[in-house]
Amino acid sequence: MVFSAVLTAFHTGTSNTTFVVYENTYMNITLPPPFQHPDLSPLLRYSFETMAPTGLSSLTVNSTAVPTTPAAFKSLNLPLQITLSAIMIFILFVSFLGNLVVCLMVYQKAAMRSAINILLASLAFADMLLAVLNMPFALVTILTTRWIFGKFFCRVSAMFFWLFVIEGVAILLIISIDRFLIIVQRQDKLNPYRAKVLIAVSWATSFCVAFPLAVGNPDLQIPSRAPQCVFGYTTNPGYQAYVILISLISFFIPFLVILYSFMGILNTLRHNALRIHSYPEGICLSQASKLGLMSLQRPFQMSIDMGFKTRAFTTILILFAVFIVCWAPFTTYSLVATFSKHFYYQHNFFEISTWLLWLCYLKSALNPLIYYWRIKKFHDACLDMMPKSFKFLPQLPGHTKRRIRPSAVYVCGEHRTVV
């Protein structure tokens, strides 16, 4: 079949469109005079084997294949932008102030510098840095619907994000293992010095894992299809291996270890509760005349000690549950986006990314609220630091406050605290 092609006159200018064609076509072509100039052939990237005013000629089109990339963002409607921005502002405000108060309490008050509280302060410090170095830029990206801070800071922000995330997970893992050793193995090995050493090791390890993102290895897509640089679809085996590695370190391995620890703790608490309830009260009464009241103190002391340990375990369990709810969706999303081209290039990927990132950031805001709710020392210290004009919450009268040291009742080490 013979086609007739009519070419319009040549107009100078630039074009950002790349046409990818792989064809061998036979055309009946009559070129206008403007196209017969020899200087125009490099611009057209056409190689003409034969050309004649009339008759059959051969046209070979050679070009380089360039994959088409969909638009970076799908524009968010105004109500959704306002909603997401308001949520982000609330999370940013609570995360920064709440975790700052936790850090200041541990730093300023010597009584708060127990091993567990030092670990919680490190977790709060990581959450506070996440609020300062990541959340504001994600908020600006939501308002502008595009990343405006350049390629270098996009990579650096991705490094900060995973650095603080891995550090927070490491602290939660250390606390869970410590609870397991205390309750199940009855080994109380953690002290403030060892806690500081573990914190230093965890920060160094987290930095080593996250640093390759800052130097472009793996090379993230910029601009990203999310409010910040995230993992995207790729066929690079090294890129895919890094995503799997960071997912294992930041979620799956800690999840399995913490879950195993909590199952062991639950089993131990169940056996101890049965032993306490089955303690023969008659034996205590029969021995009272010989041993005084010491025999009567044992079941009471065991009950109080188990109540302390159970409350401490419950607090860590709540932190673990919040971690799972906030991070499981984002971890799954990162893996699917890396290996599924269809998922990564779908039209609402930006909106999905935003909601899942906001859920991750929500964990940083919930942690200080959990400390305030569950840990009495943090609750009291927070009220003491608060100016009198801002103390709206009702407080117990002074004569009803506990006046004895918790260690006197709970029989804990001096470096322990009520968690």
Swiss-Prot record:
Protein's membrane topology: Multi-pass membrane protein
Transmembrane feature ranges: 82-104, 116-138, 158-177, 197-216, 241-263, 316-338, 353-375
Keywords: Cell membrane, G-protein coupled receptor, Glycoprotein, Membrane, Receptor, Transducer, Transmembrane, Transmembrane helix
Cellular localization per UniProt: Cell membrane
GO cellular component: cytosol; nucleoplasm; plasma membrane; receptor complex
GO BP terms, alphabetized: G protein-coupled receptor signaling pathway
Cysteine disulfide partners in this protein: none
Leader sequence segment: none
SUPFAM superfamilies in the cross-refs: Family A G protein-coupled receptor-like
Molecular function in Gene Ontology: G protein-coupled receptor activity
Tissue: Expressed in brain; detected in the frontal cortex, with lower levels in the thalamus, caudate, hypothalamus and midbrain.
InterPro entries for this protein: GPC_Orphan_Receptors, GPCR_Rhodpsn, GPCR_Rhodpsn_7TM
Purpose of the protein: Orphan receptor. May play a role in brain function.
Annotated family: Belongs to the G-protein coupled receptor 1 family.
Cited PANTHER family: G-PROTEIN COUPLED RECEPTOR, G-PROTEIN COUPLED RECEPTOR 63-RELATED
Protein name: Probable G-protein coupled receptor 63
Organism of provenance: Homo sapiens
Gene assigned in the entry: GPR63
